[in-house]
Amino acid sequence: MHPEVLDAMRPWQDKFFANPSGSHRAARIARKAVDEAREVIAAELGVQAGDVVFTGGGTESDNYAISGSVRARGGTAVCSAVEHHAVLDPVEYHAGRTVAVTADARIDLDDLRCVLDSMTSAGQEVAVVSVMAVNNEVGS
């Protein structure tokens, strides 16, 4: 971890490690810090603070991104067949489709076109397409 990040986080690990959802003094201090961080990030991104969502990790983030997109836009989702289950599971839940990959683990663009065309022909809206840029398991 970058030394500046460690220095910024040290007070929250050593002294102010309260649950920011609590009602006691330490929790209120932690909540204030979370809210201030949200404001800083929102300003950097040019969005409202309420649009910035903190999650507990990657799986929760993937689920929120896919399910939130489907719920907000309607339709379903598409992902590659080699995605992590944090992506595959919500795509499956929303009756989405998977796209094949080539022998070297790249997205099969012909299959992607075919899947999207068949969904469009069937009147299915596609809210989100999620494909990983690299895969740590197969080295692509």
What are these regions (language model features)?
Residues M1-S140:
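Pyridoxal 5′-phosphate
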